[in-house]
């Protein structure tokens, strides 16, 4: 009996160590509308696994993430674009080191028209002429009717073009401005929406329209246009072309966090990011309509968290 007692006593530290750590507290994020649905899925999963954790998600646009992360009002800044230099500098001025960008999914900026529109592809210079007042990409003519884009069918040739897009708080807006407008200025008659879903729904209900949105919001009623590359190839946005980089407007989606060099993340934040980068977390990416990270990308993201 004494021997059994001693054996159990000797195993006690190991048994205590094996007990799972019970997480509790609040975890909050602000930023991208594109990532809003995914963040909600991940947050719900995390709260189910750790009932003592409350995850709050604000999705007002990528431009809100750097300010909130720098102020310390959130632990996660969700962004559909990289932080700009001035946003990083503001964070560094306060903390003395840059924020950590953790890629969590692959997305792409896509151009959408109504599913009944016969247009087969679009050239970036045409998009610049369509959406920009400055036309820095070099286009001369400003298309105002679908005949200007090569549609000569009687019901399309004289049909006016309606432009739909995102508002300036959006990372998708900033990415489109950079990639399609050569950093030019938008026309003031582009109808702006706070989310990609609203853009796609508007295009689905309007034969005249063309818009841009996130790949994750490819809903019924619209057609995703192939984009002409510099070598004259029309590349459609699909999982293969986005992963390979053939599609010109592929982009990672990021979660930015405050991680001091050489120091671990707080346990609650670290556990959440580990879940996001797990097989189950990446399955949620697929369910939401985006592309999971590759094994190489996953390994790099996990290493950055150490």
Q: Whereabouts are the PLM-identified features?
A:
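Bacterial N-terminal signal peptides
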Residues: 3-14
């Amino acid at each position: 009996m004494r021997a059994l007692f001693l054996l159990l006593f000797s195993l006690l530290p190991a048994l205590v160590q094996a007990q799972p750590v019970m997480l509790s507290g609040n975890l909050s994020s602000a930023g991208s509308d594109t990532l809003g649905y995914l963040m909600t899925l991940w947050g719900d999963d995390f709260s189910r696994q750790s009932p003592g954790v409350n995850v709050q998600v604000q999705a007002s646009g990528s431009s809100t993430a750097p300010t909130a992360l720098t102020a310390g009002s959130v632990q996660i800044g969700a962004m559909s674009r990289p932080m700009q230099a001035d946003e990083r500098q503001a964070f560094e001025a306060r903390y003395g080191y840059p924020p950590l960008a953790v890629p969590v999914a692959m997305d792409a900026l896509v151009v959408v028209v109504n599913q009944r529109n016969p247009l087969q592809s679009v050239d970036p210079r045409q998009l610049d002429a369509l959406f920009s007042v400055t036309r820095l990409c070099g286009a001369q003519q400003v298309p105002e009717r679908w005949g200007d884009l090569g549609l000569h069918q009687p019901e399309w040739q004289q049909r006016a073009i309606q432009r739909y897009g995102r508002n300036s708080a959006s990372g998708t807006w900033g990415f489109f401005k950079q990639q399609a407008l050569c950093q030019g200025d938008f026309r003031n008659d582009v109808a702006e929406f706070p989310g990609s879903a609203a853009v796609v729904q508007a295009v689905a209900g309007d034969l005249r329209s063309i818009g841009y949105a996130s790949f994750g919001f490819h809903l019924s009623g619209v057609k995703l246009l192939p984009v002409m590359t510099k070598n004259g190839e029309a590349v459609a946005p699909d999982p293969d072309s986005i992963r390979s980089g053939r599609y010109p407007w592929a982009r990672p989606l990021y979660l930015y966090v405050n991680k001091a060099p050489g120091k671990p993340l707080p346990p609650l934040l670290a556990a959440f990011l580990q879940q996001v980068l797990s097989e189950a977390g990446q399955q949620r990416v697929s369910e939401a309509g985006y592309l999971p990270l590759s094994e190489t990308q996953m390994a790099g993201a996990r290493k950055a968290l150490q």
